[in-house]
Amino acid sequence: MFLIDLLKEHDVPVFRTHNAWSKDAWTNIVNRLNTKFNTSFSLGQVKQKEQDLKKAYRSVKDLVAESGFGWDKERMMLHAPPSVWASFAARENSKDALHWQDRSFPYYDALAQLYDSETHIVLSISDSVFFFFENMVIKF
């Protein structure tokens, strides 16, 4: 999905701090979406889509963490025995999560990289910038 690619492209300290994208990042993302697809999405529409993707990702992630659930990378969907789904369905507030019982979510891995990566730490040393990310150091 092009939006996810743009979000990942802007997932750098100059455009994103404290888990939020900057105004410049959003402006760039909206402009590039509108240019690529010859549309006129508003900033609010694009932000809402990002929030919808984030909510869906968190819902699936929470289910993957539940006992008895797993993630099928090939089919890009949750898997669990019927008894696990039945037990889960009996709980309160499970309606949104049950949505994923028979649906794939092809954006799960890409969104995991976007929302679950460790916090970026940037240090400026002798005119060099170092990004510390998931135990890797990248010098620019």
Question: Where in the sequence are the language-model features?
Answer:
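Eukaryotic helical DNA- and histone-tail-recognition domains of regulatory proteins
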Residues: 1-37, 49-68
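Amphipathic alpha-helical protein-protein interaction segments
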Residues: 15-22, 39, 93, 97-104
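Alpha-helical protein-interaction modules
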Residues: 34, 47-140
